[in-house]
Each structure stands twice: as structure tokens, then as C-alpha cells.
From Swiss-Prot:
It comes from Escherichia coli O9:H4 (strain HS). This is Pyrimidine-specific ribonucleoside hydrolase RihB. Ca(2+) binds at residues 11, 16, 124, 240. It comes from the Bacteria. Keywords: Calcium, Glycosidase, Hydrolase, Metal-binding. Gene3D superfamilies: Ribonucleoside hydrolase-like. Binds 1 Ca(2+) ion per monomer. Its cofactor is Ca(2+). Homotetramer.
Amino acid sequence: MEKRKIILDCDPGHDDAIAMMMAAKHPAIDLLGITIVAGNQTLDKTLINGLNVCQKLEINVPVYAGMPQPIMRKQIVADNIHGETGLDGPVFEPLTRQAESTHAVKYIIDTLMASDGDITLVPVGPLSNIAVAMRMQPAILPKIREIVLMGGAYGTGNFTPSAEFNIFADPEAARVVFTSGVPLVMMGLDLTNQTVCTPDVIARMERAGGPAGELFSDIMNFTLKTQFENYGLAGGPVHDATCIGYLINPDGIKTQEMYVEVDVNSGPCYGRTVCDELGVLGKPANTKVGITIDTDWFWGLVEECVRGYIKTH
């Protein structure tokens, strides 16, 4: 099995924590570093959340703080979904784990420049860190093997009728990434909403046990409530974790190649990922867009990762 070298760029975040849990444990993934961006909450909060998850699950991977603001737009957060801390629900021990002193953007640039072009970037929050790295050092572009991101939708948005939160939180950054020429895989809402985590899934992970089973339960029981209140969903989708699933085994997710453009014009479609599903524009595809996911396979994968944290001694 090939180990995919990745940098996970996230804004923890409930589903981000599940993505971290999976990426750090599955043997098909070589998690080099975790970079944190503002998104679901402000950077000071998303950083603490990322460090708390690493400390609880003993994820011994360096964590780097990145962009505290979007490139241009006024900052927004998703406190209606993720709560005041950005990771409401779990109770963590006093935090002793610390972030690295290097800025996340510098870490991304330095790591890619020193690589053989075999590192995949996995941004599952706003694309601010990735876009700034691309603008600061364009020489990283040919060094990026692939970008597998959570964001966007070819159908309806979730933060506006047109836009998904991660893209809407920094559309200009998304525009930089989608015009970069780097191979892109997009897990948008059309796919990720298929991973609604219902009470029976939570019970399954509780039965699996260990610190990851406990954390999964605390996290997803909180989003059960907020997702129903905001969207009428029967549970919280684990949006970000689909990217890790794809990297472990892309056969579990059906994708379609499309030309995708991010709308950065002010107006009702600001932040929309315009996906040319039918090819009517005649432009070459720049993105593999997730369409459907084998949910039985996916939840089995999540459980496998949860069980990986159970200590046998």
C-alpha cells in the first residue's frame, strides 16, 4: 500500500477533528504536519481546538498556526454550527501541547520546496493558507502532487443559497487555488452531505471504544443538534473526513471531471463554485468533483481508524 504524504490544513471544527483522527492513524496516510487556519472560528480558537485533539489522541505531528484573516473579505465564522469555541461538546484536559513557532504558510512553502513533488495538500477549511503560500512562492506549484479539498458545491450552498462556507469564507483565496493549474479534487456539499452521522453511527463508534470513540461521540452528538436546527438534517455530515477517505481509497468515491470557477463578484453568487457539469463552456476540466460516496465503506473506514487508538497494553 502506498503511503500518501499529506499536509492537513484545517480549521477545527467538529468534522476537522474526525479528519485529523483518521489521517493520523490510517496506515495509507503519512501525515507530515497540521496547519491551522481561521474558519469555523477565529484562529486563536481553531488553533486551541487542533492542539486539544492532538493532545487527547496523542497525535505526535507538528501543528502550525496560519492565516488569522481572509485575503480580502471581512471575516465570518460558523458559530451557528460549531459553537462559541469552534469545537463545542467535548471536554478536554488542561492544554499542555504547543504549536510550532514557524508560520503555517512558511512551513507549507519550505516543506514543498524541499520535497520531490510527492506531497498532497488537504485543505478542509478556507483556502487562505494555501493561496498565500502560492502567491508568496509560485515555485511550489509544480511541487504539489495534488490538492484534495473540502469545499464548494455544484448544487446548493449552505452559508448562502449559492455558496458553501469554506469557499464563502475566503472566495479570493479559492479563486487563486482553482486557477493554479495544480491537480484538484473537490469534495463539495453534494457529496459530503451523504455522510450524515445519525445516532446509530455514533452508537457504533461508541461501541468501538477507546479515546477516539469517546471523542467521536462527544463531537457528533453536538452536531446532531446544530445540523438539525440549522438545516433539518438527521445528523451532522463529517464533510472534511471525506477527503481522507478519498486519499485512503479513491474507489469509494465517484468523481466527475469538471471545469470549476469561483465567483468573486459581489452579489448573490459571491463565493459560488460554478461547476460546468455538462461541459457547456467548452473549457478544459480543472477539478475532479465528488459525486457519490459508498457510505457503508466510509463508516467502516472511520471505525477502523477509531479502533486504531485503542491501547492494547
